[in-house]
């Protein structure tokens, strides 16, 4: 709710009006049935937003994976933004961030047992996933597909950044909205993301009123929780110290940090690290940035200028996917590179309610699942 954070380019309003008219007509064609949305025979959950930029879609998708994977055969379908491939690609052990995109690759490496694919055409992608015989897909999670209306999801989850609520924003290019605020009405769940842990009750009430949701829509608030630093190159790290696998943030006291990010909003990570050390240099690139040879050289030079006896390079999990296969990253740097994991926490003691909302939808719309089979066996 930091309104100073929101930058509106008013001189671009005329272009935004034209863009808005085109998007509105497109949405109306779907609403009126002139353009058809396709439903599928399995639960399809869409996670998306109204704006461009980071609202935390990947961490929230990972939350759903962890919630569902033990009882259902889950598949994740993403567009694979900025990948160096086209069409439908099923993730394999040989996949890289270049072949499927950095965020899909991140999820694939963290959850290798979960089926993951990328396809610009989400209908085609779902059809391909459902044609897989083993395992037979029971739930599809659509990553960043809120505007892809050719698919009709059974449950739509809309994310909005606490610091840039969609009700405070305006359409591209003057603002960052992909479509008008009315698009929120397609969501059954709205989550205000990136909330401070100590958010006040009055802020909950203010945001609830400002979002102006319908009775059929459930509102939740979430926050980021940062885990222990993970070595990006564990084998390189073990050559120096075989006992070091991960580092708690509390161990960063008296450590010099070079923070390297290529994400939409690195400020929250920087603020988190400042809680443990004030010796931080930051090197920021655009979101989904593919690191060039010059970038790697710049990282090496900036890291070399850190004066402390103990020093590390800290990056995000997403950026780590683009560094891990980089051909010119030197062996001497690898042991010092750590990724900072992010997990989602549902606030207001609403986590159980949120989990049951998701599980209830999947259970009611799943034709066959290990969970349902065990439940039926227990009842008999």
UniProtKB/Swiss-Prot annotation:
Disulfide-linked positions: none
Chain sites annotated for binding ATP: 51-58
GO cellular component: plasma membrane
Keyword entries, A-Z: ATP-binding, Kinase, Lipid A biosynthesis, Lipid biosynthesis, Lipid metabolism, Nucleotide-binding, Transferase
A molecular function (GO) term: tetraacyldisaccharide 4'-kinase activity
Catalytic activity annotation: a lipid A disaccharide + ATP = a lipid IVA + ADP + H(+)
Record bears the keyword Magnesium: no
Known pathway: Glycolipid biosynthesis; lipid IV(A) biosynthesis; lipid IV(A) from (3R)-3-hydroxytetradecanoyl-[acyl-carrier-protein] and UDP-N-acetyl-alpha-D-glucosamine: step 6/6
Pfam families assigned: LpxK
GO biological process: lipid A biosynthetic process; lipopolysaccharide core region biosynthetic process
Keyword Lipid biosynthesis (UniProt): yes
InterPro entries (UniProt xref): LpxK, P-loop_NTPase
Family: Belongs to the LpxK family.
Name the UniProt record assigns to this protein: Tetraacyldisaccharide 4'-kinase
Source organism per UniProt: Bacteroides thetaiotaomicron (strain ATCC 29148 / DSM 2079 / JCM 5827 / CCUG 10774 / NCTC 10582 / VPI-5482 / E50)
Taxon lineage: Bacteria, Pseudomonadati, Bacteroidota, Bacteroidia, Bacteroidales
Gene: lpxK
């Amino acid at each position: 709710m930091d309104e100073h954070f929101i930058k509106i380019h008013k001189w671009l309003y005329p272009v935004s009006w034209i863009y808005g008219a085109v998007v509105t007509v497109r949405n109306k064609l779907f609403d009126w049935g002139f353009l058809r949305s396709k439903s599928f025979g399995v639960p399809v959950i869409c996670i998306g937003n109204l704006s461009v930029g980071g609202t935390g879609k990947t961490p929230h998708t990972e939350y759903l994976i962890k919630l569902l994977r033990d009882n259902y055969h889950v598949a994740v379908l993403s567009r694979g933004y900025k990948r160096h491939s086209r069409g439908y690609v099923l993730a394999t052990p040989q996949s890289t961030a270049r072949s499927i995109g950095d965020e899909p690759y991140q999820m694939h490496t963290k959850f290798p047992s979960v089926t993951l694919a990328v396809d610009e055409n989400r209908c085609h992608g779902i059809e391909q996933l459902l044609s897989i015989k083993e395992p037979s897909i029971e739930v599809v999670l659509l990553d960043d597909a809120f505007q892809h209306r050719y698919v009709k999801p059974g449950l739509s989850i809309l994310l909005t950044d606490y610091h840039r609520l969609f009700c405070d924003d305006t359409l591209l290019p003057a603002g960052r909205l992909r479509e008008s605020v009315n698009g929120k009405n397609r969501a059954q769940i709205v989550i205000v993301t990136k909330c401070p842990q100590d958010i006040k009750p009055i802020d909950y009430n203010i945001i609830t009123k400002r979002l102006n949701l319908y009775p059929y829509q459930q509102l939740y608030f979430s926050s980021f929780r940062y885990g222990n630093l993970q070595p990006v190159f564990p084998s390189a790290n073990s050559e120096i110290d075989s006992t070091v696998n991960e580092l708690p943030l509390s161990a960063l006291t008296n450590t010099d940090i070079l923070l390297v990010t290529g994400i939409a909003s690195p400020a929250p990570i920087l603020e988190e690290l400042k809680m443990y050390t004030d010796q931080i240099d930051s090197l920021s690139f655009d979101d989904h940035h593919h690191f060039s040879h010059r970038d790697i050289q710049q990282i090496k030079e900036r890291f070399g200028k850190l004066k402390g006896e103990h020093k590390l390079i800290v990056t995000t999990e997403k950026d780590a996917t683009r560094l891990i296969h980089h051909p010119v990253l030197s062996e001497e740097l690898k042991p010092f590179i750590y990724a900072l994991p992010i997990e989602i926490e549902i606030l207001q003691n609403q986590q159980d309610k949120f989990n049951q909302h998701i599980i209830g939808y999947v259970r009611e719309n799943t034709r066959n699942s290990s969970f349902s089979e065990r439940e039926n066996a227990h009842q008999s």
